[in-house]
Amino acid sequence: MEICDYPSKCLVQNPVGKNKEIKMRRLGWFVGWILLNISSHIATSPTSWALDKSVDRQGIDARVLQKPPYNLTGKNVFIGQVELSRPTRFAVDKISNKLLQIDRAIVQPYEVFFRDGKAIPNKNLDDHSAQVAAVIISQDKIRRGIAPDAKLLSSAYSQRRQDGQPEACLAAQYVARQYNSTVRAINFSFGELLSEDPRPKPLLDGNALLTLCVDWVSNNYNTLPIVAGNQGKGGIPIPTDLYNGFTVGFTREVDGIYRQVDRGNLIDEPFIDRNDNGKYDQGEVFSDLNKDGKWTAGVESPIDGRRSLALLAPGNNLKLPTLQSKFKNVNGSSFAAPHVIGTIALLHEYANRQVEAGNWSIDARRHELIKAILINSADKIQDQGDGKILGMSKTILDAFGKTWIDTEAYTSRNIPLSRHLGAGQLNAHRAFLQYQAGQQLPTSPENKSLENIKAIGWDTNIVEVDKYQDYIFAKSLEADSYISATLTWDRQVKLNDKNGNGLFDIGESFTDEGFNKLELYLMRSQDTDISQSIWSSVSQVDNLQHIFIKIPTTDKYKLRVVFKSPQKNSPSQRYGLAWWAKS
């Protein structure tokens, strides 16, 4: 069984789901990073094309966007990929030229790099990176990628045992700077070891060099970082504690539909649920991964109860090509994350059309907005056909069969995301409908009674400290229907630029400048004080707020974005807001 082409310690999920470590040695040295694919093996008698399922209605429902009338394929949209290694590129790598004719190449990145320069021919190649890329840009007729015409820029960063966070940062920065900084999103399907972080007593507090770097790159170059979630026995959580992008977990099929969290995701310490109540009880057998003698929830999650896992996507039983274009079954969050990247490429292709036609401004390309769009349109509970659950296509389950309604996020104003489910599973079609609804502006200071927003829409705007922005629905919202609303904004990170060149260089560092305190309220349109709110999302540890709640009575409502003092950095805060309701 081939695990990964890199000399590494890899996590393997065998057919009965147990994890074991395999240590591989090459050239007398070890690499301590773990690729986030849990398994891969050659498929001999496939019964279905799992990638096609994961991209179609059984998964994220992106195929409909590739067909008329939309015809979205990611054309002319730049997206990035950073990993230890990279896919092959025809005319760069002899192995690619030898094995394939150009018309048979399934995965062809637009450009390939090594850290902050050109790729080294025939070096730093592996199957894992090719399989991640295939989810996005596969040209196979049956197993077509989500955005086959997107321009993928892929960079490898690791060549020696000591290569790690600084080198990965160089690669991310270099990718983001390409083509006048028009790379819309970057995929990170790898993790760095927390145990090797050089900080004293390192924590998942967002302050690892690579995590700071990823957030700085996002804010500085207007790109959305998407990170594969931690899994297996863990140990590789950096940069899953990022703020300005988000982390993706993976789902498995239930009766042919991707809709349940795979147990391979590392969220809580695994345990045997003897009484089948979906929670750990004293005395139940568990895996003590952190060796503290007690069961731990969120064992390798960000500190202070913060949840960076925002979305789920299919990642189990996918059939993806190797460097030799042989298809293998693979599982893991590594392959869930690029489902999000591919969807982003489709959205940006649509945005390009709208901008070129003069219908939208370039603000529609803001990464905060795309983040809000994706999260707000996720599937939670299947709609029954009356639109009261906003047309959601699937009920998403945690590993114990519980839904989002059963989570602490549903009942707490302080917790925007479920620890196990995030905001739900990616739905590319719903994300498109959310985006297509277009920008709608808040009530103007000149006319505070203006009721102007539709049931579905978005905005990207600025709010000043100690001020607020009101979004008043033009029509009454229907009782017992749900409303979903998501607010996102960036934390600020400063580059400690020793040589003043405006770029991160090896030996330099970053400083966390924190994030301002924004809150999101659902109110009746006539009410003026937030104490009168119907519901709110007021997390104190997140730069994201998310509301999903039933409308109590048919009435006029509004959303209010509030910037509370004291300011953490700038007195003006850019944000992205998306909403979906039934009127």
Residue ranges with predicted function:
Residues 31-41:
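Bacterial N-terminal signal peptides
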